[in-house]
Amino acid sequence: MASNDKGLEEIPEGQIETNYDEVTDSFDSMDLKPELLRGVYAYGFERPSAIQQRAIKPIIAGHDVIAQAQSGTGKTATFSISALQKIDQELKACQALIVAPTRELAQQIQKVVVAIGDFMNIECHACIGGTNVRDDMNALRAGPQVVVGTPGRIHDMIERRVLKTDQMKLFILDEADEMLSRGFTEQIYDIFQLLPQSTQVTLLSATMPQDVLEVTTKFMRDPIRILVKKQELTLEGIKQFYIAVEKEEWKLDTLSDLYETVTITQAVIFCNTRRKVDWLTDKLTARDFTVSAMHGDMEQGQRDVIMKEFRSGSSRVLIATDLLARGIDVQQVSLVINYDLPANRENYIHRIGRGGRFGRKGVAINFVTADDVRMMREIEQFYSTQIEEMPMNVADLI
């Protein structure tokens, strides 16, 4: 922490300028403790999101970091992983303090820290208003390594000398703009005054209004600034078709015919249930098609292997459920087949959409039974898009 006020005044309000561009694109390359890495994968992460690729390493390296990121970008895990890497598990004292604007958010952060730190010997306590003060004091006396809470209660506990700050390494402010706009400015400043001078500061905020910038100039030393825009998914550049399949039972033959017509470089086939994924995998394997399957019942290790094979191209067709639609990075996939139309329209874009900046072309083919027509029309309306009947020359388009 420092009173260093050069360098940030020029930043236009609303958006910071990134001054750091190092990217680490896998968790394996972050030099994390083995038991922490195990927790990261067990939590279900496969590869780091944009903010995780940029912010985890500088925080671990000891830099003050300002990250401008919306929720949904993976920011909670960013600072949770960083905090867990930095703490000494043997030392029963608060070493990382996380402050959030609401009780709900504080509890949510605590759950993430506990889950990712599952294989580590750590305690994380949520210190929030509306709970019994005595219980809080007892929990803090036990010396949890990570404490997360709302500004009022945290300040109170430091004042009472129950939350000790002498071993504090890292102070994290999540949703700083929210916190300051809710009138917590004074408490935040007071907390800063009570922390050791050497404490490293990480600040996360969706917007950068003047009061947030003031905190950064007053209390941060040469901060690394990282701006992460939330990636918008788009259906642009994706040709969307449907095949009218009168009955559910006819879908399998339709899929086999499609296989014969089209040379598939790589495809993902989505079904709505795990049972259907397994059934379809068995049926296609029996017809001598090589496919791999993936759904939420599988162990993380097994899913990693399947994903690796698929990414490297050694497996060409992946059959999956929606659970994985959001996690599969399928930029290289030329064909997505919705064997079942998604049960809700939001998942449609997660299955077939692409990040706008990649602008990859692709083809999506929807198998539509008589019962699905209404859902398909809803999807078209919701996304203002057109799904046309699949033409005979579909092979030329893939």
UniProtKB/Swiss-Prot annotation:
The UniProt entry, under PROSITE patterns, shows:
DEAD_ATP_HELICASE, HELICASE_ATP_BIND_1, HELICASE_CTER, Q_MOTIF
Short motif DEAD box, span? 174-177
Q: Which domain of life is it from?
A: Eukaryota
**Record GO terms (molecular function):** ATP binding; ATP hydrolysis activity; RNA binding; RNA helicase activity; translation initiation factor activity
Q: Where is this motif: Q motif?
A: 25-53
Major enzyme class = hydrolase
GO process terms (BP): cytoplasmic translational initiation
Query: Could you tell me the keywords of this UniProt record?
Result: ATP-binding, Cytoplasm, Helicase, Hydrolase, Initiation factor, Nucleotide-binding, Protein biosynthesis, RNA-binding
Provide GO CC annotations from the record: cytoplasm
The places in or outside the cell where this protein is found are: Cytoplasm
Describe its partners and assembly state: Component of the eIF4F complex, which composition varies with external and internal environmental conditions. It is composed of at least eIF4A, eIF4E and eIF4G.
Write down what this protein is called.
Answer: ATP-dependent RNA helicase eIF4A
Q: Which organism is it from?
A: Aspergillus niger (strain ATCC MYA-4892 / CBS 513.88 / FGSC A1513)
* Underlying gene: tif1
